[in-house]
Amino acid sequence: MVQITKGKFDGLQRLSNEKGVIAALAIDQRGSLKKMIQQAKGTENKKDVEDFKQLVSEELTPYASAILLDLEYGTPAIKARHEGSGLLTSYEKTGYDATTPGKLPDLIEDLSALRIKENGGDAVKILVYYDPDEPAEINEIKYAFLERIGAECRAVDIPFFLEPITYDATVTDSGSLEYAKLKPAKVKASIKEFSKPRYGVDVLKLEVPVNFKYVEGFAEGEVAYTQDEAARHFEECSDLSPLPFIYLSAGVTSEMFHKTIQFANQHNVQYSGVLCGRATWADGIEVYGKQGDDALREWLRTQGKENITSLDKLLDEGAVPWWTKYGSFEDVHVVEKQ
């Protein structure tokens, strides 16, 4: 039995499909999306970013239980989303200050959990870069930061989705074999830390615990893990989390993300859905940049739709309802916020 306040419960239900699975689309990228569109189009224009997000939202949210957006470029996309699609809203500033050690997080100054809720948001999402092996003087800042967000979300009774992105302060290439060997332990440490009640997190938005480019049978070159080792890392992460968790696509291709979710399904991992971003829509950027709105719309109605609906099928096969970590739906006791 778990007690959950009505605002948080209602938010989680609005973000989930009829099976209680969070089959969500992510397009809250800001700086990186601006760069990608600029490279494809040759010009930089805020409206291009807004229009791209709006078209993605319009065409793909009929196949998503929810969409993750930002209020900097995403307002037209929020308005364009399908009626039945829930809304997660980003609260953190994009990127981090590279001149300061520790990749410290920061919030958008004119935003709050209350304002996100007033704007129709069903959940607050925060991304934080996290190296569990960095000095305490860096990590304590992040811990206190997240405690404040958790308290804010509790106060206005809105779900808190936390996305910890792990890194290593000394191994700076996150795509390297060296980092691939470190990654499982980093992801496990982040789950252990941020599942603590003090943070008030409702759903963890997690990286998969291995880099599939280095998994035996998937790797084209060097191998960091056998398939059995990779499966063990998935299972251990699943068992470690007392909270519902979903997977993020982390910039991999649609094909690779599908293989990743198939792998999780094969090993009975208790994940409750995905927040899939670039794996779904990134190939549409080149189409948009070179051929414009109508060509992108056509791409979204064909390849984009195929990317998201084939992922939905995989979720049907393996994802579990968000309340599974608490037992059955009947074990969730909804209470009014005091």
Curated annotation (Swiss-Prot):
Report the GO molecular function annotations: 6-deoxy-6-sulfofructose-1-phosphate aldolase activity; tagatose-6-phosphate kinase activity; tagatose-bisphosphate aldolase activity
The organism is Listeria monocytogenes serotype 4b (strain CLIP80459)
UniProt-listed Enzyme Commission number(s): 4.1.2.40
- Any Pfam family from its record, for instance, is DeoC
Family as reported in the entry's similarity comment: Belongs to the aldolase LacD family.
Q: Does the keyword Coiled coil apply?
A: no
Q: What is this protein called?
A: Tagatose 1,6-diphosphate aldolase
Instruction: Supply the enzyme class, top level.
Output: lyase
